[in-house]
Amino acid sequence: MKKIAIALTAALFAMACSQAPQIQQQPLENSVVYEMNVRQYTPEGTFAAAQQELPRLQELGIDILWLMPIHPIGVKERKGTLGSYYAIADYKAVNPEFGTMADFENFLAEAHKLGFRVILDCVANHTSPDAKWINECPADWYMRDSLGNTVVNYDWYDIAELNYDKREVWDAMADQMRFWMEKGVDGFRCDMACEVPLEFWQETISALRADYPGMYMLAEGEEPKLHSLSGFNSSYAWELHHMLNAIARGEKNIPELLEYIQKDAERHPADAFRLMFTSNHDENSWAGTEFERMGDAAKLMAVLTFTLPNGQPLI
């Protein structure tokens, strides 16, 4: 019996030595955010293939991985053959093109082992017009016209807008966020955050942080109340982005940049992080790459996003 105990102890010790310790996550004030499009990040377009690239991203100095929506995409009114990630059919499932839920969980576990935070894109304003909720939930969960048709905003014919006058919508959206927190994600990048009642974010973020105090929240929006009222850690510095474009074109200059920095600091709480970038998936799609917009100044502008006060750089 003594020999067996010694052997078991030795085996456990060997296993412990062979397992690399999990790397500590960086403080938010030192963090760099990386936007990942799973479909296009690798030739395979899968979680498993993206997982193999995590060591390279770690070497680049990335700290927070923001995954563009990973959920199944609606078929009805789909844009093109692939559809938009932001026309979500099922909030609690993964896009089968990317792999299985187990594949995502493996990706998440490996990312955490390497010290990354992983946040998911949370599209709370709308779903696809053939989403699971459309088929299973009351009609008044959605905004509808006088004929009962779901409402379409802008040219987004591939979505249906949710009705936040219904308490049930608040509860269901908070529930799907909790589902992913229970999976182990570290927070969310919230699409069109100001199109959803700020009070929803306030209530939901507060409730989730009671159980997950380290949850990181990034808002696609620039309203200061996203921080002071709703509890977001970070928000988009859109005005800065447009100013950097203008400076690169010679339309604005450094004094105007300094004035912006001062006014932005006055508008936002002292602990608010501002997401700073020269490009993202919206700008790259509609306004051109940073090199097309900024020319030879693109690299200099990228340096500014890493060095300006309260900034959190996005790659």
Residue ranges and their predicted role:
Residues 1-4:
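Positively charged n-region of N-terminal signal peptides that target proteins for export
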Residues 6-11:
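Sec-dependent N-terminal signal peptides
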Residues 15-16:
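C-terminal motif of bacterial Sec signal peptides marking the signal peptidase cleavage site
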Residues 20-48, 52-63, 69-183, 203-212, ...:
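Substrate-binding/active-site clefts of carbohydrate-active enzymes
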Residues 32-36, 65-67, 118-120, 188, ...:
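Hydrophobic faces of well-ordered beta-strands that scaffold small-molecule active sites
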Residues 99, 168, 195-196, 292-293:
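Alpha-helix N-cap and loop-to-helix initiation/capping positions
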Residues 175, 186, 191-274, 304:
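Active-site-proximal helices and loops of the catalytic beta/alpha 8
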Residues 262-315:
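Active-site-proximal substrate-binding groove within the catalytic cores of carbohydrate-active enzymes
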